[in-house]
Amino acid sequence: LLPTSHAAVRGRIDHWLEQAGIRPTVAGEFEDSALLKTFGASGMGLFPATEWVRQDLLSRYGVHRLAPCEGVTERFFAIGTERKVRHPLVQRLLRPPLHDSLAPVTVPL
């Protein structure tokens, strides 16, 4: 199970699979990551997910990580109007690197 080719991370996943010598049989491609996870949790196949959702996947779906995709990262951009962000995960995402306050957050898969 993979994100569609429209997803920015898909090219990096395809490159990683090629470098690892893995030629998967793609059972489905998904625009929506929640739908991808739901199909994966139902036993339809393996799927990539960011490290940040690992514990949620285990507790919500009983899904375990098979292996990390070394070198594959996903970038997130957060845009908000609220001056004081209260949600802890959003606070973590918005915490800028010391050298660039406009840099996106990069998360390993």
Where are these regions (language model features)?
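A late-sequence structural motif
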Residues: A8-V9, H64-T106
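Hydrophobic hinge/microswitch elements
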Residues: H6-H64
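Short secondary-structure boundary segments
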Residues: T4, T50-V53, C69, E82
